[in-house]
From Swiss-Prot:
Entry GO CC: ribonucleoprotein complex; ribosome
Protein's recorded name: Large ribosomal subunit protein bL9
NADP is among the record's keywords: no
Family matches, as Pfam families: Ribosomal_L9_C, Ribosomal_L9_N
Signal peptide (from-to): none
SUPFAM superfamilies linked: L9 N-domain-like, Ribosomal protein L9 C-domain
Gene Ontology MF annotations: rRNA binding; structural constituent of ribosome
Chain's gene name: rplI
Family recorded in the similarity comment: Belongs to the bacterial ribosomal protein bL9 family.
Organism expressing this protein natively: Ruthia magnifica subsp. Calyptogena magnifica
Length: 150
């Protein structure tokens, strides 16, 4: 199925490109999330009229992501977690915990945009990447400090 991309999608193309995707992927995922429109004659004609508006809004989103990147670069998130004497956590640290820590620092990030290779089970320093935009990824440091309950 041929579709018109309404935003940049990794592995498919940029805003305004025509892409061939499987019909199920388009119907069940891309179209309901307003990422694409079917490439019909009427949709192509309509898209030519609104393409400039979409590009302007995409540029604004990219600029906002760049501003957030400059503020977020070098950010260190410290998370307190209950741990044993050897630094093993009772439980684990996942993307939800990092999202809460970032929100406390003033950065609103969706959980799905935080990239962790795996959950954290030990105290220490970790490097985590956060996707702010399809083109912008920022790396942050996460410090897990353990405490013991009495």
């Amino acid at each position: 199925m041929q579709v018109i991309l309404l935003e940049k999608i990794q592995k498919l193309g940029d805003l305004g490109d025509l892409a061939n995707v499987k019909a199920g992927y388009a119907r069940n995922f891309l179209i309901p999330r307003s990422k694409v429109k079917p490439a019909t004659k009427t949709n192509l004609a309509k898209f030519k009229l609104i393409k400039a508006e979409l590009q302007a809004s995409e540029a604004k989103i990219l600029k906002n992501a760049q501003v957030i990147e400059s503020k977020m670069t070098g950010t260190v998130c410290t998370i307190q977690a209950n741990a044993g004497e050897e630094g093993k956590l009772f439980g684990s640290i996942n993307t939800s915990d990092i999202q809460i820590s970032l929100a406390a620092s003033g950065f609103e990030v969706e959980k799905r945009n935080i990239n962790m290779p795996e959950t954290i089970h030990h105290t220490g320093k970790y490097e985590i990447s956060v996707d702010l935009h399809t083109d912008i990824t920022v790396s942050i440091k996460v410090v897990i400090e353990g405490f013991q309950e009495a």
